[in-house]
Amino acid sequence: MSVSNSASPSSLSYRDAGVDIEAGDALVDRIKPFAKRTMRPEVLGGIGGFGALFELSKKFKEPVLVSGTDGVGTKLKLAFQLNKHDTVGQDLVAMSVNDILVQGAEPLFFLDYFACGKLDVDTAADVVKGIAHGCELAGCALIGGETAEMPSMYPEGEYDLAGFAVGAVEKADIIDGSKIVPGDVVLGLASSGAHSNGYSLVRKIIEVAKPDLDADFHGRTFRDVVMEPTRIYVKPLLALMQAMPGVVKGMAHITGGGITENVPRILRDELTARIDAASWTLPPLFQWLQQAGNVDTQEMYRVFNCGIGMAVVVAADVADAVAAQLTAAGETVYRIGRIDSRKDGEAQTIVA
């Protein structure tokens, strides 16, 4: 196909098309120190290769790799609205590492994907700094990632995130809920806030109620409370499993679907979990959301974590010792329920 000279533009560059290679290079330079702090001895090489290399430790005898991927959901919309980008990186890490943790896996490494229409180096650096902090909290290496600048794909000032975590567990130590029996106890570990789920409803309630986001809310601004990053439970629970091998029968990361839809994921069909809603106090953020949005109580437990970010199932005779160990590690622990035999037609998790 020929092009007439009169129609030929002056020499075009990638920058003319909306992609700034120099900005990408500047971002890599900014984030290298953050990533370096997360490195583990098993990491071979550094950032910048076509693939990231990780040598599985010889401490594993019969390792099983466990992988997870997730995003941050519409909590990002609030981050854009509030111009607050320093916490969503931790959210991204937490969603994946907490998921693989529940099967007994130690998170080993993490990769991120950051996509935008126009790369803002400061914003992206804030996000990746949060990702690196989350990796430090989880003890895993930020081993690589991808920054995709795609003109016209995203509105100005917006971006999307995806995270990928890989961990390992000894085959004999996989936690799958198969050992849970009637009489077992459900312990609840406190959440830090709404974590990264239910934010479509959070945003709708904020839109309707129009709160002052900078007003005092129990000693903090409302914006800081609603953007509080997801708690990462990895180190306390791995320490528990090492100190008391075999005591954890099942764990449920309370994410999308809330308590009522996540606890059943670790229960056999013939079991049900009876959760006592009076065993912990609904945190102020959830009280406000329920009141401001006139949200039905059961809907609250189906959408939000309602103050419980991780459920841990153990035998009744070790429940106090497990709770004490987790409390000593800095967790707030509640005895929130028990496991019973399931009756015909009964839900697998009942919050009452």
From Swiss-Prot:
Chain ranges passing through the membrane: none
GO biological-process terms attached to the record: 'de novo' IMP biosynthetic process; adenine biosynthetic process
Annotated Gene3D superfamilies: PurM-like C-terminal domain, PurM-like, N-terminal domain
Domain of life according to the entry: Bacteria
Pfam families the UniProt entry points to: AIRS (PF00586), AIRS_C (PF02769)
GO cellular component, one term: cytosol
Subcellular location: Cytoplasm
A molecular-function term among this protein's GO annotations: ATP binding
SUPFAM superfamilies named among the record's database cross-references: PurM C-terminal domain-like, PurM N-terminal domain-like
Pathway: Purine metabolism; IMP biosynthesis via de novo pathway; 5-amino-1-(5-phospho-D-ribosyl)imidazole from N(2)-formyl-N(1)-(5-phospho-D-ribosyl)glycinamide: step 2/2
Transcription listed as a keyword: no
EC number: 6.3.3.1
Catalysed conversion reaction: 2-formamido-N(1)-(5-O-phospho-beta-D-ribosyl)acetamidine + ATP = 5-amino-1-(5-phospho-beta-D-ribosyl)imidazole + ADP + phosphate + H(+)
Enzyme class: ligase
Keywords for this protein: ATP-binding, Cytoplasm, Ligase, Nucleotide-binding, Purine biosynthesis
Family designation: Belongs to the AIR synthase family.
PANTHER family: TRIFUNCTIONAL PURINE BIOSYNTHETIC PROTEIN ADENOSINE-3 (PTHR10520:SF12), TRIFUNCTIONAL PURINE BIOSYNTHETIC PROTEIN ADENOSINE-3-RELATED (PTHR10520)
Protein name: Phosphoribosylformylglycinamidine cyclo-ligase
The gene coding this protein: purM
